[in-house]
Amino acid sequence: MAVRSFAELPALLEALMRGHDRVALVYFDAFAWRFAERHGDHPLLRDAEVERWASQFPSTTAVHTTTIHSGLPVGEHGIYEWNVYEPRLDRLITPLWHSFAGDGERGTLLRVGIRGADLFPFEPLYARWEWPSYTAFPAAYAFSPATECLAASATVLSFGTTADGLELLARALGSEERGYGTIHLPELDTHMHLAGPDEPQVDAIVTATLDAIRAAPWPSGTVVLVTSDHGMAAISPERTSYVNVVWPELPDHLAHGADGKPLAPAGSARDLFLHVLPDRLEEVAARLGELLAEKADVRRVDDLVAEGVFGEVGERLRERLANLVVLPHADEAAYWLEPGRFEQRFLGQHGGLSPDEVEIPLVRWLSA
């Protein structure tokens, strides 16, 4: 049976809402298929329908957060990675933080007059639906420029702990005769970035989160879906190849932005996108391919587009995409070094095409 893509999820949600009074989507960040298999005897999963689905590429939160609120696949919305090129600024930005890439703080784009709607000019699903909708986010970004746009026309709920957020959402749905709600749970993702996906505490977080989902006071008959945006691959700072260290002349072959710096790094350490000068693309692809032969695959982005890896590519994605991507092998990472701004310190990362990063579950559970 063909594996379904996360891009199909918005249509499934709408179909479920037309057949049920209440639907809840638990967006369990980094809850990979392998974790669903490992915890298959948990009461929530044991009593549910569980299917294997696939992330969109790149397998990142920016892609899937935008899809789940806008209803658009990455090929249409164009927010394809944590760091992406923004044409109107001729700079790399971090859309979900509403900042310039590497700033390390949220909201710096507000200082240059860029609003959330400039980056997320889409009508959210909730504006098109005729039933009440709720979106729950951790307090740190519940009312950020990005979430205020993506969640427009929904009631935004801000929470502290996972259990508190689930209870808030469940009670909000209980206050409506008919309604939809979604919640973003980032704890597992955050932990694995810092400690790695194989660290013992990972299983404890998964169990505690599944327990909290099952224990939340969902109204009887609520269809509760649990899915994720991506999985997680093990990496390390010691096994990170910095492309501008491996090849010191590389910056001379890249396009430069409005700040005079190379347009790097777009993407992440598992899918490093480079904006190469068009007339240098063949040379850079060949040379980086040689230098990283034992560490990564170096691919022309146009080849991936032709293979359908991004799905249908529209104007918003096309004008933001780089033209070369480095896809590290298992246990490897590739990034750009600018001390104090761009360094690879994580033990877990995602964005690539490996099964550990791409395979995700879709859990469908009916509350009693």
Residue ranges with predicted function:
Residues 1-368:
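Feature captures the catalytic ectodomains and active-site-proximal regions of enzymes
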